[in-house]
């Protein structure tokens, strides 16, 4: 069974992330969305909420599982029994970092391959950072995120 692990902070999960998950779900028997705790990134949403939002966005995909983690990714991928890391590339600017990460992961988990997918053209410009900035300034984020994510962002910024 081919199991792919798609790690990220997903703060929040966007339509670009969802697009990659949908395509991975067609390519692999089992897709694991691994939501990283990432405390050094100071995420807007707590880990549990990011996991729940990712589950909501992907609930229509029976071969997709969402889990949170706070350990070293190379250890976590082995715990999950995955044999592939999935990473998204939006632009050439993403490549250098992702290339370094893939090579580091190869050193730490040599049996796990890195696979890069590009999002559909209509999602290639979306980033979680930009979505958070737009939401914080009261902009319409409905084109960029699932309705449940938009609701969570809007609720979060109405409190501030």
UniProtKB/Swiss-Prot annotation:
Pathway assignment: Cofactor biosynthesis; coenzyme A biosynthesis; CoA from (R)-pantothenate: step 4/5
Residues annotated as binding substrate: 9, 41, 73, 87
Lipid biosynthesis as UniProt keyword: no
Major place of residence: cytoplasm
Domain of life: Bacteria
GO biological process, alphabetically ordered: coenzyme A biosynthetic process
Residues flagged as site, Transition state stabilizer: 17
Swiss-Prot/TrEMBL catalytic activity: (R)-4'-phosphopantetheine + ATP + H(+) = 3'-dephospho-CoA + diphosphate
Sequence positions that bind ATP: 9-10, 17, 88-90, 98, 123-129
Record's subcellular location: Cytoplasm
UniProt keyword Nucleotidyltransferase, yes or no: yes
Gene3D superfamilies tied to this protein: HUPs
CDD domains reported for this sequence: PPAT
GO cellular component, one term: cytoplasm
UniProt entry keywords in alphabetical sequence: ATP-binding, Coenzyme A biosynthesis, Cytoplasm, Magnesium, Nucleotide-binding, Nucleotidyltransferase, Transferase
Cofactor annotation: Mg(2+)
E.C. number: 2.7.7.3
GO molecular function: ATP binding; pantetheine-phosphate adenylyltransferase activity
Assembly and interaction partners: Homohexamer.
PANTHER family: PHOSPHOPANTETHEINE ADENYLYLTRANSFERASE (PTHR21342:SF1)
Name of protein: Phosphopantetheine adenylyltransferase
Organism placement in taxonomy: Bacteria, Pseudomonadati, Pseudomonadota, Gammaproteobacteria, Pseudomonadales
Gene that this sequence comes from: coaD
């Amino acid at each position: 069974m081919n199991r792919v692990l798609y790690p990220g902070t997903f703060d929040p999960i966007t339509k670009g992330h969802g697009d990659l998950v949908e395509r991975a779900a067609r390519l692999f028997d089992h897709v694991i969305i691994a939501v990283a705790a990432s405390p050094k990134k100071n995420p807007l949403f707590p880990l549990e909420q990011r996991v729940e939002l990712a589950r909501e966005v992907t609930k229509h995909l029976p071969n997709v599982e969402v889990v949170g983690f706070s350990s070293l990714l190379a250890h976590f991928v082995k715990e999950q029994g995955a044999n592939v890391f999935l990473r998204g590339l939006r632009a050439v600017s993403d490549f250098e970092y992702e290339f370094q990460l893939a090579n580091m992961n190869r050193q730490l988990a040599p049996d796990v391959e890195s696979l890069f997918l590009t999002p559909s053209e209509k999602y290639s410009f979306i980033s979680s950072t930009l979505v958070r900035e737009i939401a914080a300034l009261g902009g319409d984020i409905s084109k960029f995120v699932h309705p449940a994510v938009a609701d969570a962002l809007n609720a979060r910024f109405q409190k501030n």
